[in-house]
Regions:
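Solvent-exposed loop/turn segments connecting transmembrane beta-strands
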Residues: 30-39, 61-71, 97-107, 127-137, ...
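Repeated loop/turn-to-beta-strand initiation elements of outer-membrane beta-barrel proteins
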Residues: 17-19, 51-55, 82-92, 118-123, ...
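Detector for outer-membrane/organellar transmembrane beta-barrel domains
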Residues: 105-166
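Outer-membrane beta-barrel "beta-signal"
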Residues: 117, 180-190, 210-224
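Membrane-embedded beta-strands of outer-membrane beta-barrel proteins
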Residues: 43-45, 73-75, 92, 110-112, ...
């Protein structure tokens, strides 16, 4: 979510601030569910400076008990390619994810991305994915296209590669996830319906079967 906001703000010629408040029927992360949390509420804020630096924070909460699911923070830098049209560029960032109170799953990722017309291609490296011993590399392509003033379509494909496992542990297999959806702008609101899931490879065996299934996601958000 924070990286997606950076694509929009990175074209700013002056300092810009953007905040977003939204809700979703279910929380999904890289093609999988994150637990039996039900509907969730998200708030985020981003600041982009003319020199190319940007930063953002976001939080995700359960609706049934207002408990924090996770919090994220990102600091990055974006730029343009002088020889290419202005809608081409690049960005790099550090991203930190915090889960609930104990912090056992907290992890940091480094990101490098290529930005183009209606798409962003990014690679993410985590030395301790979800606080564990495995390092991972995640490559994702996100794209969107406006059909008219109201309707837009969007899609995503991501590939997660695990490094060597800890001693005497089997290596987690790679996997590929996809997402496709359609959105509508209704006044100040953006309403989206999407379907995501794992299309190749397998999730870790310790995850609940429900989290490994594909799912529909209905969401709505407003920017301010």
């Amino acid at each position: 979510v924070l990286a997606a906001g950076a694509v929009v703000l990175s074209s700013a010629a002056q300092a810009q601030f953007a905040g977003t408040l939204g809700a979703a029927s279910v929380d999904r992360y890289r093609g999988m569910g994150t637990g039996d949390d039900g509907a969730v509420v998200r708030a985020s804020a981003m600041l982009d400076l003319p020199v190319g630096a940007y930063g953002g924070i976001s939080g995700l909460w359960r609706t049934h008990d207002a408990g924090l699911v996770r919090a994220e923070a990102m600091l990055g830098w974006s730029g343009r390619f002088d020889a290419l049209p202005p809608d081409w560029g690049w960005d790099a960032a550090l991203h930190r994810t915090h889960y609930d109170a104990n912090g056992d799953k907290d992890f940091t990722e480094a990101m490098l991305g290529l930005l183009g017309p209606d798409f962003a291609l990014r690679g993410w490296f985590a030395p301790h994915y979800f606080g564990g011993y495995s390092r991972t590399f995640y490559t994702e392509l996100n794209a969107s296209h406006a059909l008219d003033a109201r309707w837009h379509v969007f899609g995503h494909v991501g590939w997660l590669h695990y490094g060597p496992a800890a001693d005497y542990q089997p290596r987690t297999p790679d996997r590929t996830d996809t997402l496709a959806g359609i959105g509508a702008t209704l006044g100040d609101w953006d309403v989206q319906l999407a379907r995501d899931g794992i299309v190749a490879g397998h999730a870790r065996g310790g995850l609940d079967a429900r989290d490994r299934r594909a799912a529909w996601i209905l969401s709505a958000s407003v920017a301010f």
